[in-house]
Amino acid sequence: VTTPTNGAVRATGRRRTRAALAIGALVAVAGASAVTVALLGAGIAARGTGELHIPAPGTTTVLRAAVFTALALHLGELAGARLTGTGPTPRSWALWTALGGAAAAAGQIVLLAEVSDLDLTATYGTRDGGLLLAMANGFALAAGCVALRRPGWATGPLALVIGAEAMRAHPEPYTPEWGTALTVVHLTAASLWVGGLLYALRTTRLRGGAAREVLVRYARLAGWLYVALAATGTCSTLRRLPADVVFSTAYGRVLIAKLALVAVASALALAARRRLRRGGDATRPARAEVAALAGVVLVSAVLTVVPDPHWLSLRSALLR
């Protein structure tokens, strides 16, 4: 039996310290970049477009990103608990994500009241205020289900949240019911993709030799989710973004950034699936996929804040 020398132990310790510092620096840079995108993304995208100014775009982006994150984590945990089968499971985040989602929705109500110069009671009576109130109540009910140790019951309140957000995102007079239906499917599939993958990765850390089976089960669902996302995303884009203003509107520019991140996440997902088929370890590309999907969630929040591109297309047509 050989024992490591003091020099070997010190060298190992230095390597671990350097790795920890590198990871910490990477996390700090990613966090700073996320804050910058959230606070300044909508303004940068709208620069030079001549579009109407959106009040408090940075704060709105942060709050909507928090809502999307809460949905993804909670739905992903509900689906992941069924997918991963028997065995050790990670600690539940459902209660805190539901409470965070409720706080983010309530924060949007307060922000809407402030920018509209209305009191809270009057804000509740507006279309957006009423839908945000429904979202806050949905998250609160989901938190109550978790607190009562009935986590599966949270599916109903979370469905209310998704429906309210889909209706809020489509106030346009032209076929809003189609836009709402597309967003319901798109938001549900996106939440399950992001949250389900994160939950699967958290579970793999506890399963040891059975970790690969967890990712295999998730991959089966992810394929169908990707098809749903591609179909609904394409239809929504064709409905909402006129071809003549793809590069001249904030919506078009942000959408291009989102598609680039989705392409990165898709490539990483394919790499992970290829490793699974060969019997290898897919953890590393799956972790990178989660990071790319976090960027997608953030850019999606920016996309909900920028102006509807139709008016600029119409104005251009009238000026010709």
Name each region found by the language model.
Residues V1-R320:
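Polytopic transmembrane helical bundles with strong interfacial aromatic enrichment
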